[in-house]
């Protein structure tokens, strides 16, 4: 005796309704063999649709067993049930259940995508099926552009995409006119002639008479199961000749009758998880996974494009968040670099030595131990690039009839280099001028404007510094500082000239030491303190390391950037919540689409992937737009703020993309998980 292809044994299905359960199927026993054409007939509410859902592995029995090819479906997990639906069942629904936003070819390709069929192969198969069913010229029409009969033929073609060993047709003619209904019945007869098992669920006895076997169901129980004595007449009415139909339709479905006429074809085994699979299997799995991912990306893009305004509003929070993060980081980096440049202009990598114990020491003026010999000793140290002395007084300057007070500083020839000062006119004095106490002077722009005006060239002019004539040989360039513009008048002369001819003192007010590049500033500071203490016999001085200022500025800049970035991240989180909200709405709107995908064999992971990809795509697009806006803001910033610029780093941009992706994953996961956990029956029933 032949083993049935589909077998229900003592199947009961009940649904909760308040405090009680409603029994929809009661102790149903049914066997269907391969190659049969069966009609399940019953009135509305009789349980026929629930029976079809159990047969198609969309639902499961509350009690009893259902086997497919001898395999108990109760023992299968959700992915294995999806594999059964994908590879052995094809559904033809009364309401067609086609995706409205894609064309006929794309609707047909959907089961093959989840089966891992290569793109070229599934595309060719879809076009072939449409051609054989008379829809070659409608291949790229969307469902809304097709008649009801044409949509049902597309639905039949989709059921055949992966072979369709068992065709489950739920009221296949219910929404069609008479002519279209007859065409659908004829196609089902032709498929049965090829060996497909056909199960027609209907309330119309005129449709049921086209089956070889009629099963009547009432109040959840099978009340009759009999052969159809009028089947031959119905076949003739449909205009189907079995022999001709088999020959003509074999090419239409592309299946071997021999294969489909097996009495007990074995359903596929569970997916092999053996890590020692061969390379070819891994390649096929990778190709199948890539195809599903590409489909998820394509459908996500279609969903976003079909709701442009909603997508833009959803992305707005992400755009604002990413723009804020990238811009704030760029502003912080630009500000930090500008501040460091400003500090560099007054001498970076330098250590200043002053008399006394600290700032404000009342006895500092009485300490006269800093002398030029200390400068010479420091210059000889391996960690010192240069050392320059400094002594200063406020003296009267006179040029012709103009008298002004200015700060006159006696410095060494390396002073200007150590302080990073540039010259607008002339040059600095050299070592020879220092040694010979030459009466030359370098002035700043403020002094130039006071004595000579803004346009006159002062080089070579003689000015009186406290009645000592000095020749102007250089003018330093103006500096626009973040710490404010300097209004004081400054004159620099060789420290030997200042000590011997102007101040009458042999000691120094301070020494500026420039540390060699690559030498640790803190270690150099300790070494020079040790040296100076040895020379003086006691520590009667203190040091001020400019490196500490640099570190303070860097730390302050980092703290400020972090604070502002945290504020911007709040905006990003708000945007992420908006994405989650819209994705939840999208899942609700597309519940029927989810049900269709599950019916044709999509796994829960496929549904999860599709909606997760959609959320990530929204966030990535928002991130890309946000980064572009940040660059635009950077350009505008440069137009209005000339002193410094926003500095964009590759790290900040990569971080922005990572943040937008993580936002999509984190806030898109819950809606995607909700979508993947939908019951396919409930999903298909929703509008």
Curated annotation (Swiss-Prot):
CDD domains named in the record: ABC_MJ0796_LolCDE_FtsE (cd03255)
Signal peptide stretch: none
Superkingdom of the source species: Bacteria
Pfam families reported in the protein's UniProt record: ABC_tran (PF00005), FtsX (PF02687), MacB_PCD (PF12704)
Biased composition (Low complexity): 246-256
Transmembrane regions listed in the UniProt entry: 312-332, 560-580, 617-637, 650-670
Keyword list, A-Z: Antibiotic resistance, ATP-binding, Cell inner membrane, Cell membrane, Membrane, Nucleotide-binding, Translocase, Transmembrane, Transmembrane helix, Transport
Protein topology in the membrane: Multi-pass membrane protein
Chief place where the protein resides: membrane
InterPro entries for this protein: AAA+_ATPase, ABC3_permease_C, ABC_transporter-like_ATP-bd, ABC_transporter-like_CS, MacB-like_ATP-bd, MacB_PCD, Macrolide_Exporter_MacB, P-loop_NTPase
GO annotations of cellular component type: plasma membrane
Residues involved in ATP binding: 42-49
The enzyme's E.C. designation: 7.6.2.-
Annotated stretches, region: Disordered: 246-281
Record localization: Cell inner membrane
EC class: translocase
A Gene Ontology molecular function term of the record: ATP binding
Family: Belongs to the ABC transporter superfamily. Macrolide exporter (TC 3.A.1.122) family.
Quaternary context: Homodimer.
Name of this protein: Macrolide export ATP-binding/permease protein MacB
């Amino acid at each position: 005796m032949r083993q049935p292809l589909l077998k229900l044994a003592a199947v009961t299905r009940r649904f909760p309704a308040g405090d009680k359960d409603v029994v929809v199927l009661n102790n149903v026993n049914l066997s269907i063999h391969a190659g049969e054409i069966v009609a399940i007939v019953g009135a509305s509410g009789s349980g026929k649709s629930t029976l079809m859902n159990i047969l198609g592995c969309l639902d499961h029995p509350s009690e009893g067993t259902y086997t497919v090819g001898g395999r108990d479906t109760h023992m299968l997990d959700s992915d294995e049930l999806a594999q059964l639906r994908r590879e052995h069942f094809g559904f033809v629904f009364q309401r067609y259940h086609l995706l409205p936003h894609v064309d006929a070819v794309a609707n047909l390709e959907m089961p093959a995508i989840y089966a891992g069929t290569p793109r070229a192969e599934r595309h060719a198969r879809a076009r072939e099926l449409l051609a054989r069913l008379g829809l070659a010229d409608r291949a790229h029409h969307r469902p809304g552009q097709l008649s009801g009969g044409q949509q049902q033929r597309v639905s039949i073609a989709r059921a055949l995409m992966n072979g369709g060993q068992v065709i489950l047709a739920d009221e296949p003619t219910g929404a069609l006119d008479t002519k279209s209904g007859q065409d659908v019945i004829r196609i089902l007869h032709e498929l049965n002639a090829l060996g497909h098992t056909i199960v027609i669920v209907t309330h119309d006895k005129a449709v049921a008479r086209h089956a070889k076997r009629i099963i009547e169901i009432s109040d959840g129980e099978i009340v009759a199961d009999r052969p159809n004595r009028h089947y031959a007449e119905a076949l003739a009415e449909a205009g189907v000749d079995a022999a001709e139909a088999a020959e003509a339709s074999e090419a239409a479905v592309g299946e071997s009758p021999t294969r489909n006429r097996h009495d007990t074809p074995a359903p596929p085994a569970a997916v092999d998880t053996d890590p020692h699979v061969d390379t070819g299997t891994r390649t096929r799995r990778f190709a199948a996974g890539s195809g599903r991912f590409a489909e998820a990306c394509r459908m996500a893009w279609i969903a976003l494009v079909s709701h442009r305004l909603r997508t833009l509003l959803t992305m707005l929070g992400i755009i604002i968040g990413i723009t804020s993060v990238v811009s704030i980081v760029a502003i912080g980096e630009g500000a930090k670099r500008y501040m460091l440049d400003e500090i560099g202009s007054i001498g970076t990598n330098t250590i200043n030595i002053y008399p006394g114990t600290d700032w404000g020491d009342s006895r500092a003026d009485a300490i006269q131990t800093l002398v030029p010999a200390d400068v010479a000793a420091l210059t000889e140290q391996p960690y010192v690039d240069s050392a320059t002395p400094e002594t200063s007084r406020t003296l009267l300057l006179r040029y012709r009839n103009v008298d002004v007070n200015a700060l006159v500083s006696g410095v060494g020839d390396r002073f200007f280099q150590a302080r990073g000062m540039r010259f607008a006119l002339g040059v600095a004095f050299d070592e020879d001028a220092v040694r010979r106490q030459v009466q030359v002077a370098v002035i700043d722009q403020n002094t130039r404007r006071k004595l000579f005006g803004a346009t006159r060239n002062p080089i070579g002019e003689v000015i009186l510094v406290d009645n000592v004539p000095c020749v102007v040989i250089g003018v330093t360039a103006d500096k626009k500082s973040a710490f404010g513009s300097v209004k004081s008048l400054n004159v620099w002369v060789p420290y030997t000239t200042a000590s011997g001819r102007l101040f009458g003192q042999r000691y120094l007010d301070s020494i500026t030491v420039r540390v060699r590049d690559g030498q640790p500033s803190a270690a150099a500071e300790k070494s020079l303190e040790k040296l100076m203490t040895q020379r003086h016999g006691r520590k009667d001085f203190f040091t001020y390391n400019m490196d500490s200022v640099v570190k303070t500025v860097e730390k302050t800049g980092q703290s400020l950037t972090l604070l502002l970035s945290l504020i911007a991240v709040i905006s990003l989180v708000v945007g992420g919540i908006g994405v989650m909200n819209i994705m939840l709405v999208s899942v609700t709107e597309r519940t029927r689409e989810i049900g269709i995908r599950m019916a044709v064999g999509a796994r829960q992971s496929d549904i999860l992937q599709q909606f997760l990809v959609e959320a990530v795509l929204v966030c990535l697009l928002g991130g890309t737009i946000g980064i572009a806006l940040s660059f635009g803001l950077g350009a505008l910033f440069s137009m209005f703020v000339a002193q410094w610029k926003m500095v964009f780093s590759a790290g900040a941009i990569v971080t922005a993309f990572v943040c937008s992706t993580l936002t999509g994953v984190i806030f898109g996961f819950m809606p995607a998980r909700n979508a993947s956990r939908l019951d396919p029956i409930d999903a298909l029933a929703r509008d």
